[in-house]
Design a protein with these regions (language model features):
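Glycine/proline-enriched, intrinsically flexible loops and inter-domain linkers
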Residues: 1-320
Length: 320
């Protein structure tokens, strides 16, 4: 503003937004108009609610695009409730994936995009609903849900489902030396395969973008030992293009700790597309015994927590 003045600055913003809007409408113009719907299910909310439905109907027309989530499940007792703003962010992300590379991220891209929700529901809860996992888990599944619907309109552009969870692992304790500690990480998994490529293995996808914690840093700063960190072979869905593989991460506790797990895709598998196979669901283990997708546990020295993250869905009928 100091360099060019308020008037020129304002006109430049208007020009960028107008350009973004034209790009968005042009991209939508390449899609056959109509209504495209999809359904998927969250495993559970940790309080007995299971098979929680996520549903979307996407209407595409010359006037723009709308994402209707109103048929999704009611809000739940657990923290999978997803604020409307987070649901909108998931839809915006998917919308941007339809645009040309280099499209400017601006309000104009979303000028003709509408988000429809129902309150109270799992996609627009009422206060004081718990929402922590709505941001890290439900948002991931909304992305795959939207892609599943869009695949009906754009079958040769949309990938199969990715792992669909951030595999949240949190732990901590007062500490044997009197110093409290806490540690939180999200774990990568398999990416869904697409029409032109296999899915990548052991990567973060869609709504998560964290890096893995190096073993050296983990063991230096915390009373933990990383005993296994590997690709989970065979977890990606079969297909003309195979889904990406998940990973295996095993941590040994050197002193007692409280552990919280917030994970998904332990029951409903990442789906394949166009004849591709589903990816494998994930598993959580403590000392060889399976534990729930959402769990609070107390570990003692010598205990081992092992997480197997989901693979991605395959794309296309597998070759003979």
């Amino acid at each position: 503003v100091e360099s060019y003045g308020a008037e020129l600055y304002s006109s430049a913003l208007t020009a960028v937004n107008d350009y973004g809007r034209r790009l968005s409408l042009a991209a939508l113009g390449e899609v056959a108009g109509g209504i495209y719907s999809a359904e998927d299910f969250l495993d559970d909310d940790g309080f007995g609610g299971e098979g929680l439905a996520l549903r979307v109907s996407i209407e595409i027309s010359e006037a723009g695009i709308s994402y209707d989530f109103t048929e999704s499940s009611d809000q739940v007792r657990g923290n999978l409730n997803c604020p409307e703003s987070v649901a909108a962010a998931a839809a915006y992300y998917c919308h941007c994936c339809l645009l040309p590379v280099g499209a400017p991220l601006c309000a104009g891209l979303f000028k003709d995009l509408k988000i429809l929700t129902r309150k109270p529901s799992i996609v627009n809860p009422a206060f004081p609903a718990a929402v922590a996992a709505g941001n890290v888990e439900t948002s991931m599944r909304l992305v795959d849900l939207v892609f599943r619907a869009l695949a009906k309109a754009l079958p040769h552009r949309i990938p199969a489902a990715s792992q669909g969870t951030m595999n949240n692992v949190a732990m901590g304790a007062a500490g044997a030396n009197g110093l409290s500690w806490d540690y939180y990480e999200t774990l990568a998994g398999g990416a869904g395969a697409g029409p032109h490529r296999p899915g990548r293995s052991a990567v973060h996808t869609h709504m998560t973008n964290t890096l893995n914690t190096p073993a050296e840093s983990l063991e230096y700063h915390y009373p933990l030992r990383l005993t296994r960190f590997a690709i989970r072979r065979g977890s990606g869905g079969l297909g003309l293009h195979a889904g990406g593989e998940g990973l295996i991460r095993e941590i040994e506790f050197l002193e007692e700790a409280q552990v919280s797990l917030l994970t998904e895709r332990r029951r409903f598998a990442p789906w394949g597309l166009d004849g591709g196979g589903d990816g494998e669901v994930g598993y959580n283990w403590l000392n060889g015994e399976k534990i729930a997708a959402k769990a609070d546990i107390f570990a003692v020295a010598g205990d081992r927590l092992l997480i197997e993250t989901p693979g991605g869905g395959g794309w296309g009928t597998p070759p003979d």
